[in-house]
Amino acid sequence: KMSNQSKPLSLIYNHNAGFRIQGPEGSYEQLTEIFSAQGYQTKAYEINDSQQFDKIMTEVLEQHLASSESGIIVAAGGDGTLNTVAKHVLNTQIPVGILPLGTFNYVARLLGIPLDLLEAAKVIATGQPQRMNVARINQEIYLNNASLGLYPLFIKKREDYNRIFGRLPLHAYTSALDVLIRDRKELKLKSW
């Protein structure tokens, strides 16, 4: 049942995650068709850096909270993009949709969200919001895990490779080898 008033849908996408508004495959147009068929009015926001992210998310939240229909805020990117969007939306009642465009998409897989972009959009447009647990350590939130040791080094090195050589799935493997061969560090933990 479609309401007469359109519901806001803010599509927050990481320009590094492979999603483009102007794509040859027309995926953005297909997404907006799926969303508008369910009464959503889509507005896209490209994120380039963390300062811009904070500014855009403040604007997006104000728009959604001012609307009689809170709508949906969609994170289009990987787990990092999703985590940053969730951090801003955490203390609101606004649902977050996931368009999984990252390398691993752990959260989307954990929640059973289709990895196909258009199928994930259909879930966002027609599905029911589900609550999920969120962990908080200091000022950071974690949707699927928090890691110590080698894994965070792998991720940092992979992002370095992506920044230097462009975004390729192969970097997940080559950066891990680089960490194992050159970047080993001793980690001491103290528990109380």
Name the predicted role of every residue range.
Residues 26-28, 90-91, 159-160:
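Short, solvent-exposed amphipathic alpha-helical segments in soluble enzyme
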Residues 80-94:
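Short Gly/Thr/Asp-enriched flexible loops that form oxyanion-binding sites at enzyme active sites
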Residues 77-79, 102:
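A short acidic Gly-Thr/Ser loop motif
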Residues 1-72, 83, 87:
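ATP/NTP phosphate-donor binding region
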Residues 12, 16, 38, 47, ...:
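Catalytic core of DAGKc-family lipid kinases
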Residues 75-76, 98:
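Short beta-strand scaffold positions
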Residues 19-23, 77, 93:
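Short coil/turn residues that cap or connect secondary-structure elements
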Residues 5, 69, 92, 137-138:
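Residue-level preference for short coil/turn positions at secondary-structure junctions
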